[in-house]
């Protein structure tokens, strides 16, 4: 589900350290069952298909005939591709780009920002802090709305549904990530 992937990227891009996005993750390339391993990936072979650049027959990756491909492509008619997603404001690729820009603009979310977990209850709530700022991150991948008490600040960014802060309580829709600072 694309909405869940967006929330997962919010989690990934709000963690300390250098985030790692493997090619195709940003467009939601899928695992393709039953591909022959050509590079010893075996269990990962289905996640190593060529990049899907566009919606052409060969996904913009090759001009070769299908029987000459070194690694098979995702043959699905609805396979995601970079060109289409770059044209859609609500696509996974567009959200990932916005999240990267948000991370770069906020020192607390960058590699050296500290992390502290608020509790071990659901939803996942943690604080990212730097000398310049503190951001509370709420990750709610579930379908139900949640409330989180004792959060100060205003909503800086949301992924998925909507969220509000009222009197120190965050109310967030299901399948939503919220950044409050």
Q: What function would you assign to each model-found segment?
A:
Residues 165-181:
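C-terminal beta-strand-rich structural cap/linker in extracellular carbohydrate-active enzymes
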Residues 62-63, 69, 157-161, 169-172:
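Short, surface-exposed secondary-structure junctions/capping segments
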Residues 129-131, 150-151, 171-172:
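Flexible, charged surface loops at secondary-structure boundaries
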Residues 123-125, 135-139, 157-158, 175-180:
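Ordered hydrophobic segments in well-structured contexts
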Residues 136-140, 149, 166-169:
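Short amphipathic beta-strand/extended segments with alternating polar/hydrophobic composition
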Residues 144-161:
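Beta-strand-rich binding/interaction modules
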Residues 1-135, 141-145:
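Loop/helix patches that line or flank the sugar-binding groove of alpha-linked glycan CAZymes
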Residues 115-117, 127, 162-165, 169-170:
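Short, exposed beta-strand/loop patches in secreted or surface proteins that constitute
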């Amino acid at each position: 589900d694309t909405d869940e992937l967006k929330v997962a990227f919010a989690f990934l891009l709000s963690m300390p350290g250098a985030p790692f996005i493997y090619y195709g993750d940003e467009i939601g390339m899928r695992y393709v069952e039953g591909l022959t391993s050509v590079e010893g990936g075996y269990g990962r072979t289905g996640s190593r298909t060529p990049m899907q650049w566009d919606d052409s027959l060969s996904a913009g990756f090759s001009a070769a005939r299908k029987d000459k491909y070194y690694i098979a492509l995702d043959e699905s008619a609805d396979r995601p591709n970079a060109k289409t997603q770059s044209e859609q404001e609500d696509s996974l690729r567009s959200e990932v780009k916005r999240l990267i820009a948000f991370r770069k603009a906020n020192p607390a979310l960058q590699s050296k920002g500290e992390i502290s977990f608020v509790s071990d209850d659901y939803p996942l709530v943690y604080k990212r802090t730097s000398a310049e700022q503190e951001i509370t991150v709420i990750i709610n991948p579930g379908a139900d709305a949640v409330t989180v008490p004792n959060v100060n600040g205003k909503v800086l960014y949301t992924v998925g549904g909507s969220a509000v802060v009222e009197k120190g309580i965050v109310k967030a829709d299901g399948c939503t990530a919220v950044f409050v600072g």
